[in-house]
A protein has these predicted regions:
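Conserved, structured core segments of small domains
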Residues: 1-111
Length: 111
C-alpha cells in the first residue's frame, strides 16, 4: 500500500508558560506567523493553524510537516519565536495518508 508520510506537530500551551505583556505577545505572534509562512513557502509545512473549541483548551495549534525525520520537524518547530519564548510545548508524531489526500481545500472562513 502506498502512503504519504507527514509529521504532525501538536502545539500545547503549558500551564507554566511565561507571563508576557500584550505587546510582547503581539510581537511573538507576528514572528510566529512569518515563521510558518516561510516554512510553507519552502514546502516544509503542508498546512498549519490554530485549534479552537476542542475538549482540551491547552491544545493551541497543529502543523503538518514535510520533513524526512521527526527530529527535523521538531527543530523547525523550535525555531519559531513563540516556541523560543516557551509558549507552545510541541509533540511530534507520524501521520500517514493516501497519496493526494491533502489536495482538497477546506471550507473558507473569515476571522
Amino acid at each position: 500500500m502506498e502512503l504519504e508520510k507527514f509529521f504532525l506537530v501538536l502545539l500545547w500551551r503549558p500551564a507554566d508558560h511565561p507571563a508576557l505583556s500584550a505587546e510582547e505577545i503581539s510581537t511573538l505572534q507576528a514572528g510566529h506567523l512569518a515563521h510558518y509562512d516561510n516554512l510553507r513557502r519552502l514546502n516544509r509545512v503542508a498546512f498549519n493553524g490554530p485549534v479552537r473549541e476542542g475538549p482540551d483548551e491547552s491544545l493551541r495549534g497543529l502543523a503538518f510537516f514535510r520533513t524526512r525525520t521527526a527530529a527535523e520537524a521538531l527543530e523547525l518547530t523550535l525555531a519559531d519565536p513563540m516556541a523560543r519564548a516557551q509558549w507552545p510545548r510541541p509533540e511530534v508524531m507520524d501521520f500517514w495518508t493516501q497519496p493526494g489526500a491533502t489536495t482538497a481545500p477546506g471550507l473558507p472562513i473569515t476571522i
